[in-house]
Amino acid sequence: MPLRLDIKRKLTARSDRVKSVDLHPTEPWMLASLYNGSVCVWNHETQTLVKTFEVCDLPVRAAKFVARKNWVVTGADDMQIRVFNYNTLERVHMFEAHSDYIRCIAVHPTQPFILTSSDDMLIKLWDWDKKWSCSQVFEGHTHYVMQIVINPKDNNQFASASLDRTIKVWQLGSSSPNFTLEGHEKGVNCIDYYSGGDKPYLISGADDRLVKIWDYQNKTCVQTLEGHAQNVSCASFHPELPIIITGSEDGTVRIWHSSTYRLESTLNYGMERVWCVASLRGSNNVALGYDEGSIIVKLGREEPAMSMDANGKIIWAKHSEVQQANLKAMGDAEIKDGERLPLAVKDMGSCEIYPQTIQHNPNGRFVVVCGDGEYIIYTAMALRNKSFGSAQEFAWAHDSSEYAIRESNSIVKIFKNFKEKKSFKPDFGAESIYGGFLLGVRSVNGLAFYDWDNTELIRRIEIQPKHIFWSDSGELVCIATEESFFILKYLSEKVLAVQETHEGVTEDGIEDAFEVLGEIQEIVKTGLWVGDCFIYTSSVNRLNYYVGGEIVTIAHLDRTMYLLGYIPKDNRLYLGDKELNIVSYSLLVSVLEYQTAVMRRDFSMADKVLPTIPKEQRTRVAHFLEKQGFKQQALTVSTDPEHRFELALQLGELKIAYQLAVEAESEQKWKQLAELAISKCQFGLAQECLHHAQDYGGLLLLATASGNANMVNKLAEGAERDGKNNVAFMSYFLQGKVDACLELLIRTGRLPEAAFLARTYLPSQVSRVVKLWRENLSKVNQKAAESLADPTEYENLFPGLKEAFVVEEWVKETHAELWPAKQYPLVTPNEERNVMEEAKGFQPSRSTAQQELDGKPASPTPVIVASHTANKEEKSLLELEVDLDNLELVDIDTTDINLDEDILDD
């Protein structure tokens, strides 16, 4: 089949005329030497200019990377060779190499040598380990030596192209050429070796507009390629693909098949004359140099021609050589996820065509090799030719004995047991075909599915697929497009019913043939089904699987990998890369079987599979169950305490949540469980949870809401002990234990608040608190401390104090016992009461009232003296006036001080 050369431009770098290009073997860099004397390094992944070397003012006709030394070596029209370190941009060395323009540089792949050619008709060998001494001079050409290239299969041999119309092949160590190839009518500009092991070929391009292929063993021209309209300036065998790339001063780059010599493609990017080309082993990138800049294009698919059967036998093609490896041969060797497998490779022979794709049939007995417009079906064991033919595309059916080929853009043929069974023309043409349970045909109008047996249209879908993957059962299918993928269910029973009755058939087929299960916005590169689980590699190099609407990431890949298959008995998934390295990742078949059973709602089967799932994998399964809505089963399966606790909360399983909270000893969990217990009216459990969580605020809310005075009392003591002073204060206050509130404020140094509390609720304690406040404040501000008026000394500043003593005593006697919460509706709210009025007529006991009036305290705390002589009162007033006159009031709020009217008048 024709080469499917997807050609994508990766970089366009506008610049002055480009005389040579090179690609770095490990970095994403392109080197371009310019006619204006500069050398540039471009990053073709980021499309940015990363380095520039100002070499000289004359054209730089040659530049090469020496990656093992971190060098760029340049040759210019000033006859100088310059060596730069491309990391530091420092010039490492410079010397005069020739007596005329330097045309080409070739770097030896293993030795510390470079070869240079020049218009002085000489080729020179330089050894950088010997201080860049000239080790050898090769004489023989009679005109400019335009290019030299080292033989990749024999590093001691190189070839040269000259304007004397000849190609000479040389040996290192010999000053005269081995032989000369003649055939061009004009000067030869370029030359290259074929790197494959099957052909001893050279290619050359000349000013006679021809490209010639030479057999350098027989010293004959085997092919001449015609097509360019001007001088051929560059020609190259691609090191990976079966193609020849030629560039000309006519502005075109032509791509030829290296086996058939058929012209496959012509590129013209409108950048004037083409001067140079560069490619790299292991890469599909090709660099091109033009008059107006340089371009990098990516040719073809990087996906390797590789396939694996269900038993672990892998077949791949390395160029035209077919090789095999068997995973069984590894035995019980330990395999680590993502590591390259040490496989023993066996040569199976060469293929008559260049393989672009290799694919086993479903039962693994046969393998088809496609390429060059042909297909060959071999036996998988011995690679014996079973069948062959011409085709643009090939697809296996679900039935191993059946397959289809796309003969042209309008004809599809179906074969059974290697014999043609049916040929048909799809209504809207055939741009591509897809195998599987149904035959898929893509056209400009969309995708059409046909029955393999009778080619009846099953369903037409307006979609442009890239890949189609069928499950083994034929129930599920994944259709992958350029931007997303769809999971569909094939309703075969409905299709059979319609085929029998022919009812409900439209021009687009059977409407109910498929049911859409989901669309995922992710690009699928390669994929396969295991049960009802779709495993795939994505465009961002993730290895995922999709089941039941959930995407699970198995691994993050460090490079592009291609799925080969899954072997259930190994519980491993196998992938390969473009270098034909095989890696694997663990994926338990029991997990996939369980998820498949759940998706089919076959819980009896799921219960049978569950014991085979290792404990470390059960939490993953539980998350899957949760997402499917089976939270009760997820709670049973999960082994992660965090996950189980969350599920228990969601399901209201108090006992399980309590056990998990006890094991975890987490305050957060106790709080969450307390909320659940309150919502379930389990107040005893809620109290215990809040206690474990040390949530005193929550306990206070619970205690007050339930009217539990004993709980409030214990909470007050506990909160005070643990330093939760706000909760302790509120707990004491709610119980009417104002004296305890006061002592708490004093102990915590909140003396101003204590003074106001005492003035409001415990006037008998005001004097003591003010004294403590004054002592404390004097350490900071003596004047502010002196401004505090003690009620024992300035009784006139505290009107109603005597009555307050009486009210305090009345409150103590009448509110000694707490009222039951059930009497709350009968109690007058505090804001509606006048305690002074209620206490009228109350006579405090003699022992207390008389002591207060006589100035003798009833308790160790000081109280205000009830009466003073007139002289003492007058003296006190005078002293206060003097104090007030001498006091600077700084940040003192006097708005709440009640002064007597006569003092205000004075």
Swiss-Prot record:
rRNA processing as a keyword of this entry, yes or no, is no
Q: Which key words tag this protein in UniProt?
A: Acetylation, Coiled coil, Cytoplasm, Cytoplasmic vesicle, ER-Golgi transport, Golgi apparatus, Membrane, Phosphoprotein, Protein transport, Repeat, Transport, WD repeat
Post-translational modification N6-acetyllysine, affected residues: 627
In this UniProt entry, the residues modified to Phosphothreonine are 861
Q: Does the keyword Protein transport apply?
A: yes
Q: Which Gene3D superfamilies match?
A: 1.25.40.470, YVTN repeat-like/Quinoprotein amine dehydrogenase
For this protein, the record's InterPro entries field holds: Beta-prop_COPA/B_2nd, Coatomer_complex_subunit, COPB2, G-protein_beta_WD-40_rep, TPR_COPA_B, WD40/YVTN_repeat-like_dom_sf, WD40_repeat_dom_sf, WD40_rpt
Q: Which top-rank group of organisms is this from?
A: Eukaryota
Q: How does it sit in the membrane?
A: Peripheral membrane protein
GO MF term set: structural molecule activity
Q: Which Pfam families match?
A: B-prop_COPA_B_2nd (PF04053), TPR_COPA_B (PF23953), WD40 (PF00400)
- Where are residues bearing Phosphoserine located in the sequence? 859
For biological process, the GO terms are: endoplasmic reticulum to Golgi vesicle-mediated transport; intra-Golgi vesicle-mediated transport; intracellular protein transport; retrograde vesicle-mediated transport, Golgi to endoplasmic reticulum
CC per GO annotation: COPI vesicle coat; cytosol; Golgi membrane
- Region feature Disordered, mapped onto this chain: 837-863
| UniProt xrefs under PANTHER family | COATOMER (PTHR19876), COATOMER SUBUNIT BETA (PTHR19876:SF2)
- Its biological purpose: The coatomer is a cytosolic protein complex that binds to dilysine motifs and reversibly associates with Golgi non-clathrin-coated vesicles, which further mediate biosynthetic protein transport from the ER, via the Golgi up to the trans Golgi network. Coatomer complex is required for budding from Golgi membranes, and is essential for the retrograde Golgi-to-ER transport of dilysine-tagged proteins.
This protein's assembly is summarised as: Oligomeric complex that consists of at least the alpha, beta, beta', gamma, delta, epsilon and zeta subunits. Probably interacts with PEX11A. Interacts with SCYL1. Interacts with JAGN1.
UniProt family annotation: Belongs to the WD repeat COPB2 family.
Identification of the protein by name:
Coatomer subunit beta'
Query: Which species does this protein come from?
Result: Pongo abelii
